[in-house]
Structures are given as C-alpha cells and as structure tokens.
C-alpha cells in the first residue's frame, strides 16, 4: 500500500460522522430532541479531541526537547557562504539555530571536510573533485567569494577567501555547545567514511550517553546501507533517513517498517508531505524533518501537519514562526 493512499479513521471520528448526518432530522423535531442531539454531538467531539490529543502525546519527540527543531541547512546559507565558519557562526551564535547541518566529503589524504558537492567548482575558485585534492591543496581555495558575486546585497569582505573547514575543526570550534546534524554524503565514493565519522565524534566527546540522549549529534543520509553501517558501529546514534523528492509517496508499509528498524526519523523533500501522510508517519513513531523549507507559509503549513522541525537556509524565519505560535 502506498503512502499517499493511507487513510486513518478512529472510532470516535466515525461516530461523529454518523451523528452529523442524523442531526438535521433531529433538529426538525421538538426542542428536547435538538438539545439531546447537541449534547451528544458535543460529547462525541470531546471524545474525538481527547483521542487525538492522546495519540499526539505518544508521538516521537525531538531529543533536544523542542517541539520544533531548527536545522541550519549548510549553516546560515541564506546569509553567508555555505559550509564555512561564516555560515556556521551566524546560524549558531547569532540566529540560535538548534543544529548546524554538515555535509561530508573526503580529501585525497583522508580528511573529512564540510562540502555539499563532490566537486569544488560551485562553491570555490577551484575545479575538480574533492577526492582529488589533499587537505593542504583544498585549504588554498577561496570558498566565499562566489557568494558575494551571487548575492551582492548580502556581500561582506570577510567572506572573501573563506576556507573549507574539516569536521574536526568544526567540532573543535563549537564543541558541546552546539548540536550537529551530519550527513554521510556520497558514501559509495568514500568507503569507510562512517568509521572515520565515529572516530571523530568519539575524539571530541560527542558520543557519550548524555550527548546522545540530548540529541547533540544526529546522522542523516539518503543511503540506507550507510545508515545501517552507522547503526552497526554505534546503535545509540540517532539516524535520519533522507528521502529525495518523489520518493516518499512510493514507500510501502514494508519500506517504512524497514526504515524504522534503524532510523528514528525521516527527512523527506517537503513538497511530498501532506496532512495524511504526516500523521501516518508520526503514528509509526517517526520524527519528521523535511528539507529545504525557506518560505514562511510552507513552514506554517508543515507545522500544522505535525512535523518536528525543518532544514532551512533561513533559521531566523523558522525561529520567529515557532516562537510566535
């Protein structure tokens, strides 16, 4: 059965539906019949509301304790060059996002670095694949000037010649004062990157029972094998299965059960979510963190559906919305 065909109907809802059909006939009788109908319908509505509230209270909650978590997509990438300390500092220190989101690639000499693409062309003045650069060579590239050229209204001189950070540098800079939402990007290109990620997180004290309990680290991936490997290496790390655009509607019950066996949540492309499939995912015990949500109207609509947070380039927009709500 496909996700976009699920319908969840409670007993209380069926009762209310039946009463609403019979009410007009009752209303045409004497006042006592109308009063009885109104009383019964109000009681049924209360039962329905209580049933819904009880169901919602059992839904999976963010480990940070927040009703809605704000994931700074590649840092504050709407305001600063993505995956640079400029973007991370702004999202963490200035905007107050819940998580710094980090995409991982690996250099020729084995260093995990923060970069979305497998090539350096889009976000630096270099050319070629990350895996063909040593860390020293990668550090010579300018990872910020492109942003000033594309966004002259947001340009800052400090962005010029920004550097590509390593995972270790990021963890050293923010330590346990930040939360990290880390993606194993292109794990097929970088075999063994899961082991390296575990080693780095251990080195920086991010895999203690307390850190994991409080959601200081979440690992995400589009790759099921990569997440399953992470689960084998450390079964206590919260994992999120990312679902590309158009992928969510084709997940069967068996698919979702399999995902739930290793992941605490899913990160679907946000336009694939609707009220029904959001509720079904929540009823199955998933956290739901859709990507990449940059418009306030979409943020509000998704919150109304029942999601638990968003990936966004504009953490300030989402934070303002959830603080007002």
Where are these regions (language model features)?
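Phosphate-group recognition and catalysis centered on beta-loop-alpha active-site segments
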Residues: 3-12, 17-325
């Amino acid at each position: 059965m496909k996700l976009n065909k699920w319908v969840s109907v409670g007993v209380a809802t069926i009762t209310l539906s039946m009463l609403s059909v019979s009410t007009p006939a009752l209303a045409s009788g004497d006042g006592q019949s109308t009063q009885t109908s109104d009383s019964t319908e109000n009681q049924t509505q209360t039962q329905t509301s209580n049933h819904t509230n009880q169901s919602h209270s059992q839904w999976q909650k963010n480990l940070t304790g927040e009703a809605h978590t704000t994931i700074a997509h590649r840092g504050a990438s709407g305001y600063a060059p993505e995956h640079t300390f400029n973007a991370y500092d702004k999202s963490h220190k200035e905007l107050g996002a819940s998580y710094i989101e980090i995409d991982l690639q690996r250099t020729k000499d084995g260093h995990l670095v923060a970069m979305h693409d497998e090539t350096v062309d889009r976000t630096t003045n270099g050319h070629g694949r990350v895996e063909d650069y040593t860390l020293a060579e990668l550090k010579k590239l300018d990872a910020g000037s492109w942003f000033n050229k594309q966004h002259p209204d947001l340009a800052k001189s400090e962005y010029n010649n920004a550097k590509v950070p390593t995972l270790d540098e990021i963890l050293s800079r923010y330590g346990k004062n930040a939360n990290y939402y880390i993606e194993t990007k292109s794990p097929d290109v970088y075999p063994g990157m899961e082991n390296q990620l575990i080693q780095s997180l251990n080195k920086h004290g991010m895999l203690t029972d307390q850190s994991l309990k409080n959601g200081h680290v979440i690992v995400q991936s589009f790759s099921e094998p990569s997440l399953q490997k992470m689960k084998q290496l450390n079964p206590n790390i919260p994992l999120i299965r990312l679902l590309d655009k158009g992928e969510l509607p084709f997940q069967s019950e068996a698919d979702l059960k399999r995902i739930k066996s290793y992941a605490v949540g899913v990160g679907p492309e946000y336009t694939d979510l609707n009220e029904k499939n959001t509720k079904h995912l929540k009823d199955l015990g998933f956290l739901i963190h859709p990507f990449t949500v940059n418009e306030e109207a979409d943020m509000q609509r998704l919150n109304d559906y029942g999601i638990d947070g968003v990936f966004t380039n504009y953490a300030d927009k989402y934070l303002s919305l959830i603080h007002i709500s």
